[in-house]
Amino acid sequence: MVHFVGAGPGAPDLITRRGAALLQAADCIIYAGSLVNPALLGLAKADCTIYNSAEMTLEQVLAVMRQNEAARKTTVRLHTGDPCLYGAIREQMDALDADGIPYDDTPGVSSFCGAAAVLSAEYTLPGVSQTVIITRMEGRTPVPED
């Protein structure tokens, strides 16, 4: 089983309870090292295998997931914020679907929500705006060449 887990906006105490429990139970954690606070790895059990995906290609990440599934081990794929928002998980889920590997998604607190909390602001105001548009600059996080 592969669990896609949102790490939240950075502070270790802002990960969800479910996300923390999955990290504590995982046999393997693959985390986005260039983006995820490494303090979250302190939740891992002593014999957990940990990979920094910033140093891996997509195929290498998928190979680890496949190996763990074959060994009946639980993998957490730890993404920054919420994995469904700019997390690039679709390509991973498509590959897992093709291989018949089960997975689920545990949402995280996205940084745009964390920013509103820090600023004591709200994004929607009655009679003013009921719309939130989330966008970012074009581009991808660099990955190693195959």
What are these regions (language model features)?
Residues 1-109, 113-114:
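Class I S-adenosyl-L-methionine
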Residues 1-5, 103-104, 112-146:
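Beta-strand/loop-alpha-helix module characteristic of Rossmann-like adenine-cofactor folds
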